[in-house]
Amino acid sequence: MLTLHLQDDDVAAIDAVADELSRRYDSVESTEFQAESRLYADELPRRVRRALHEYRSTEKSGILVVTGLPVDDSALGATPADRRHKPVPSTSLRQDIAFYLIANLLGDPIGWATQQDGFIMHDVYPVQGFEHEQIGWGSEETLTWHTEDAFHPLRTDYLGLMCLRNPDGVETTACDIADVEIDDETRETLSQERFRILPDDAHRIHGKAPGDESARESALRERSRQRVASALESPDPVAVLFGDRDDPYLRIDPHYMQGVQGETEQRALETIGAAIDDAMSGVVLSPGDIVFIDNYRVVHGRKPFRARFDGTDRWLRRLNIARDLRKSREARLAATTRVIY
């Protein structure tokens, strides 16, 4: 795990850029903001840019924690209780901008039409009625470790989580495939395209389509829903391990791989699952901390906790970050848009 501790002058420089942009934009969902964000990311301190560049290019570790950004708890207001809560401007606008710009040093933040109503900036907080679900709104059940959006060929390269509030010290669990030891036979099996992954529940909760969307957007949205339905009905077989044999990437989501494997495949999954459990570590994020997770190297999850639903619960912001937007061009409305259908 790599750590970047922001110094006072780093924070001052980031704040100056965030202040300027927060006067011009009231949301990071603005396409104009997204178009300019890369330019402003280049104005972040060289020390910050170097740390993110080295993390991206060297792959020395799949986890990078950035600490030191300020968060005024009183200015945030209550932790939202409803997943549709999206005020404009956000009470965390300055933090959102800083988070977005730092994420831009890894790639382009993206959203999903089938997840959180197509927003780029996601929320992670407990919602009543979802306590036992395997999604970001859950709380009382362990969020089983997984690759983010493992079922999807356009899954994110990096996942970013920024902590706004974590009064109970809830741990984000993580494990780098480089730390996992398995036998050669299991490795060989896992490297073959024999494993099926179902779409996770977050992609099955579809928001309401806007009434004024274009015919092309409607067509893309319907195709996206059909893809999820098809993946539920008959998921394509994929390899769990891929890339370099001795230093592989991985793609796995055990909770959504149960009951759809053959006996040999299931044994291989159980073997690597036990090895990942043995190598599992984690990080407890404090307000202002950001953790970046290489989604090709690291599985992540969350320890269980009991939510109070009183406005003081754990609250994170989340970004999915793509290294190459062109891979998803056929699934986006335009070259300038960031939502994948």
UniProtKB/Swiss-Prot annotation:
GO MF terms, alphabetically ordered: iron ion binding; oxidoreductase activity
Cofactor note: Binds 1 Fe(2+) ion per subunit.
Chain spans, region Disordered: 203-223
EC class (word): oxidoreductase
InterPro entries linked to this entry: Alpha-KG_dependent_hydroxylase, AlphaKG_dependent_hydroxylases, Clavaminate_syn-like, TauD-like_sf, TauD/TfdA-like
Knockout consequences: Cells produce dideoxy-mannopeptimycins.
EC number, UniProt record: 1.14.11.40
SUPFAM superfamilies, sorted: Clavaminate synthase-like (SSF51197)
Family statement drawn from the similarity comment of this UniProt entry: Belongs to the clavaminate synthase family.
Pathway the protein takes part in: Antibiotic biosynthesis
Residue ranges crossing the lipid bilayer per the database entry: none
Protein name as it appears in the record: Enduracididine beta-hydroxylase
NCBIfam families associated with the record: GntD_guanitoxin
Catalytic activity: L-enduracididine + 2-oxoglutarate + O2 = (3S)-3-hydroxy-L-enduracididine + succinate + CO2
One Pfam family of this chain: TauD
Keywords linked to the UniProt accession: Antibiotic biosynthesis, Iron, Metal-binding, Oxidoreductase
Chain's gene name: mppO
Cofactor: Fe(2+)
BP GO terms, sorted: antibiotic biosynthetic process
Domain of life per record: Bacteria
UniProt: Fe cation binding residues: 146, 148, 300
Role this protein plays: Hydroxylates the beta carbon of free L-enduracididine to produce (3S)-3-hydroxy-L-enduracididine in biosynthesis of the nonproteinogenic amino acid beta-hydroxyenduracididine, a component of antibiotic mannopeptimycin.
Organism: Streptomyces hygroscopicus
